[in-house]
Curated annotation (Swiss-Prot):
Stated name of the protein: 3-hydroxyanthranilate 3,4-dioxygenase
Stated family: Belongs to the 3-HAO family.
Gene3D superfamilies reported for this sequence: Jelly Rolls
Enzyme Commission (EC) number: 1.13.11.6
Amino acid sequence: MERCVRVKSWVEENRASFQPPVCNKLMHREQLKIMFVGGPNTRKDYHIEEGEEVFYQLEGDMVLRVLEQGEHRDVVIRQGEIFLLPARVPHSPQRFANTMGLVIERRRMETELDGLRYYVGDTEDVLFEKWFHCKDLGTQLAPIIQEFFHSEQYRTGKPNPDQLLKEPPFPLSTRSVMEPMSLKAWLESHSRELQAGTSLSLFGDSYETQVIAHGQGSSKGPRQDVDVWLWQLEGSSKVTMGGQCVALAPDDSLLVPAGFSYMWERAQGSVALSVTQDPACKKPLG
């Protein structure tokens, strides 16, 4: 049986890991990657992946620089706000001192590639890029960044066409990027439905990511090919899995590994989230 992890306590215990130059630490590294990221860390590179990313700011604000439909823009994610980044959107996180954010992404499929790009100023022109199968982003990015800093492209600010792909592995997304929203305000506005036993999706069904808010009641999580991350925000609940039971108090979290079914009983006044990212639900290109 997986043990529950109290989020804020875990962050405090690992506070030293969130200082430069590393700035991040994984709570879970299975099919779901549950990562917490500190700062400061300002970047010029843009990351591109075929999956989606969930951002939530626990402490302070951050800026996520994105290339959206051909235009560079800054998405400000403030403390307490949650945000879902669509797949195939170039993005560059800008983090500041004394901040802490949660990032959730998934293990890549064997057929998927990640990209790291530098652009010429605020244009769509690619200055430098590398494409790779991502197994450990924390260790794979640093050598690519160092390669760029020692490159002729960095020195001259001009791309080398011979080192750029004629066609990228996949087209960039044409979706509009949503605005971040206050998680607390969203939950409060739906409290009546949640406490009546209705579970609600924060982002709808047009993404492979499902962030579901749950109030009081019980539900059975079927055996899935993906992990499920549970985060108890208010009240209490009880999870039974593999014949064992674990109690969740406010701010406790629990990872249900792929291949396990579970029963989740939530007491009156309970508010909790469940998060899944299923690549089998990848949406058509767009």
